[in-house]
Amino acid sequence: MGVVLLALPVLLLVAVVAARIYFEHYLHSEAFRKSLGEAAAKSLNADSATFAPLEFDGGTVFGENFQATRGDGGAFSSLDADQLRASFDWHGLLRHTVQIDEMSVQRLNIEPPAAAAVEAHTAQSLSGAGPAAQGPLDGLKKGWTVDLRKAVISEANWQWSDKPGGGITGTALTLIPNGPGAWIIDAQGGTVALAGWPELDLDTASMRWQSPTLFINSAGLRNGASRLTVTGEIETRKAANLQVKFDGVDIRPLLTPDWRERLTGRLTGQANVDAPLGNGNAARQLTVSGSMALTEGVLTALPILDEIGTFTHTERFRRLELTKASADFTKSPDRLEVHNLVVESEGLIRVEGDYTVVNGQIDGNFEVGLTPATLQWIPGSQEVIFTDSHGGYRWTPMRLTGPVAHPHDDLTSRLVAATEKAVIKSVDGVEGTVKKTGQGLLDLLMH
């Protein structure tokens, strides 16, 4: 018995060494690399996943490349990772588990699925068919599993859409598991691009993935002096609901080419973005609603203002510096609705109203207010047109219709008619004394 007791530690040591040798041999085998690829493919819901030959140094493994492909229209069509390095716990191998304490990736590229595949995948999901959604690296129920404790990606490039184009490039990611199917994700740096919008630099983003939804706790973006803060959630292949606060956003890139020469300034406000995902009509169903104010605003070469400037001999109308400009809005791909619009150059003019733009055609109803001092240069205007008085302005309604680039108003014609009538009456001695500019306005109308 004593001999057996003395030999037992030796036998255990031999068994441990033999097991270590066996596992080391197995880890270098093609069978293990294939099993690891199958585990990763299952976790990613991919059709295939392959690792380049792996190199081991104690508890650290190195790999040149990892690739995964997916053709069912899910989260990606291809995933390509370069320069992988992982530290793992040997004890997990006894449980058929690859326990990775930390994995680092130098570069990760993710390409979006084709539009047709996305539509087919969405239809299958809505019908209840197909496999249930999994979080990244949730593991297998049988065979080998992957237990990733932390992932650090130095450079991630993710194209999430090709029609319209959109994605993020050059961002650094840190991912930490936070329960079954859940991950805490921190992002830093990189550039966000979306077709039709200026590029934005990402400062930082704090997010949480809980399959199948990405929760954005906070994301800070900038473009020059522009600053945006984004919160909200994105439910995979269903919908995105985001809240955006913006400050100092240059308005010109958001305008049509004709208006970029007429209006300058910076936007401040907030907006809600609702976007369906996973179908070919998603881009046509996007809606944005919110409120905004324009600071440092300047209106230049607006026809109606030029006309008022001509009538009043006031050059300030030709380059109107705005002391206040604000509105509520709802924007969809084929329609813009603006309510509670207020545009004012204090002591000169104030405009209030609502309008819609559909298929490039504007239809709006406004109230235009001018100061009595300004209107004194327009004979008959206060008696016939600007008849209402409040808030330091004399007011009249105005209708604006036609192409957005060259709209038509009904105020100019009324000003012309009223002024002509007043000047003619003055010449005939009916009206009495009128300011000398009346004759100048008559000359303008006749020539």
Each model region followed by its residue ranges:
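N-terminal type II signal-anchor transmembrane helix
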Residues: 1-44, 429-434
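Extended terminal
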Residues: 1-6, 17, 278-284, 316-317, ...
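Secondary-structure transition motifs
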Residues: 37, 44, 65-180, 262, ...
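Short extracytoplasmic
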Residues: 38-66
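Amphipathic hydrophobic-ligand
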Residues: 46, 73-88, 159-175, 197-204, ...
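Glycine-rich, small/hydroxylated-residue low-complexity segments
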Residues: 49, 88-91, 98-100, 216, ...
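Transmembrane beta-strand segments that form the barrel wall of outer-membrane beta-barrel proteins
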Residues: 153-158, 186-190, 213-219, 336-341
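Beta-propeller and related beta-repeat scaffolds in trafficking/envelope systems
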Residues: 166-214, 260, 291-335, 374-406, ...
